[in-house]
Regions:
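Mixed-charge (Asp/Glu-Lys/Arg
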Residues: 1-138
Length: 138
């Protein structure tokens, strides 16, 4: 995931831990910086669609960050309906959902950053975090 964004010119921070003293308080899957946006990444590769846990984990991590920080959850086998409902009703709306098929499509087209911009635009204009990149020629 991170490498695809890096190839297209985004600055990335590879997975890291946040520590207080000697204790790890967070494990971050990565961060992306592009076009004035700062994004925290949570990536899951479960056999089944991801449930609410990755979303709630990322939401807790975002609560400790500047308000403009956006989160992105990548789930290679999609999301359960409860996960999508939760993400749609978060306040503030700051977590974008990426399904595996969308990521594969964006990588094949070398348009991962364009996909991010389409998802951000939809979230701002429509208020939903789960825009499907298969809906148009973004």
């Amino acid at each position: 995931v991170l490498r695809a964004f890096e190839i297209e010119g985004a600055r990335v921070r590879w997975p890291y831990e946040v520590r207080i003293g000697g204790d790890t308080i967070e494990q971050i899957d990565g961060a992306i910086y592009h076009n004035g946006h700062a994004l925290l990444i949570e990536a899951k590769h479960y056999r089944d669609p991801a449930n609410i846990e990755p979303i709630t984990k990322l939401r807790a991590q975002l609560a400790r960050r500047p308000p403009a920080t956006i989160g992105m959850v990548f789930s290679f086998n999609g999301f359960t309906e409860p996960a999508k409902i939760l993400a749609r009703h978060l306040n503030p709306q700051q977590i974008l959902l990426w399904e595996g098929a969308e990521l594969r499509l964006a990588i094949e087209k070398n348009r991962v950053v364009s996909g991010l911009e389409a998802k951000l635009r939809y979230a701002v204009e429509q208020g939903f975090p789960d825009y499907s990149l298969s809906l148009e020629a973004w």
